[in-house]
Amino acid sequence: KLGGTTPLEVILKFPNQDKNKSDEDDEFEDWGEGENKDDEKYWFTKDKIDKIDSVHNYLDGLPAVGKVLSFSSIIQVATQLNNNKPLGTLEMGVLYSKIPESIKKEIIDPYISIKDNEARISLRIIDSQDGLRRNDLINKINYDLENKLKLNKEEFKLAGVLILFNNLLQSLFKSQ
């Protein structure tokens, strides 16, 4: 039995943490020029990691979903390498700052955008599954992310070939 998969991506958007600025701080503003690299290692907060992990685990539990990859996958491997002790946010930040750029590009950048304050979860939908209704699956994921995982609509977006294909099919159905 042959069958394929269709990619779907869930983009998680995190609220911007604007630093409280007052007029008094302006005279010292030029001191923080090297701050950007430091800010990167502080991006890895418990809330962000927990949110990525909960969405990853939810998607992984759906019967129509095949492989799920995200920053959570990397954390799972790092935990195994750390004698099954979970990494703390400080350890993740330090590790991130010490990883060579070439490795960051390969294993972290596809799943985390610190600049955009986003995380990407990539998954494959099993097309050969009996009774797969793509539109219903997309609606279920949207509903569950909002109602079961308590994310706001502004905090996530579904994208990828599955969405394009589903939109094409829906347009065809409506034109009949």
Write out the residue ranges for each language-model feature.
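Extracytoplasmic
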Residues: K1-Q176
